[in-house]
Amino acid sequence: MSRSDPGSGTMNQHLVVCGINYHFTPLAIREQFCIPDSCIGHALEALKRFPHIKESAILSTCNRTEVYAVVDDVRGGMADIEAFFASVQHVSDHEILKPNFKLLRDDVVLHLLRVAAGLDSMVLGEDRIMAQVKSAHQTALERQAAGPLLDFIFKLALSCGKKVRTETSMGRRAVSVSSAALELARTRLGSLAEKSVVVLGIGKMGQICVKHLLSEGGSGAVVLLNRNQERITAFLKSKLNNK
């Protein structure tokens, strides 16, 4: 198959996406599916071993963990992706934690375009998602998991996302869940300079929120609360090492 022609040889190839996202799944469950950036490459290698998966890419953020794939059989490919998710979960109850988001063919392309454009984000126009989609694309190429079809639709999505941000009002200022939360707090409470701020949870969004607070010097004491104390310790050590 020629890389310059994603449509060649696709008679028995089907585009699918399968996973979980914030529309259907609460945060506590999304955390069980989350694949750290450092593990994405290994996860792609695992996907290669499934018989029906011919191409794959993984987009894993705070709000979604989605496997984009080209499969030679829809039912078999979806079963392979579900088996993959069962193998990477951090708990054993696979009946409760099955992926509940699935799309086929053209709907996959439309979904990825919306994601990259920030139209499917928890905060409309979220700016970080473009970098996350780009990273998912690059890692899939580097691991030789993405072939011509996924390469094509990811490039299309990134181009669309860039165009939306340059030609509409969504690109006028940086937007994320963390920045929106801080903006809302300042709107309701006024200046945070003399106030203690409690950050509940030290996942990706919590860490970004803390970094915003520290870099801007925009609050008094910052208190971190998390179910896992070791995660707070690791985050604080990384902050100290980066100084």
Predicted regions and their residues:
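Glycine/serine-rich phosphate-binding loop and adjoining beta1-alpha1 elements at the start
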Residues: 95-192
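Conserved short-loop catalytic and cofactor-binding motifs
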Residues: 31, 169, 220
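Solvent-exposed alpha-helical segments within well-ordered globular domains of core cellular machineries
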Residues: 45, 83, 110, 131-134, ...
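A general structural signal for well-ordered secondary-structure junctions
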Residues: 53, 91, 163, 219, ...
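Conserved active-site and cofactor/substrate-binding residues in soluble primary-metabolism enzymes
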Residues: 38, 42, 62, 76, ...
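Short, electropositive, low-hydrophobicity segments enriched in small/polar residues
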Residues: 23, 122, 129, 205-207
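A glycine-rich (often HGG/GG-containing) alpha/beta subdomain
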Residues: 2-3, 9-121
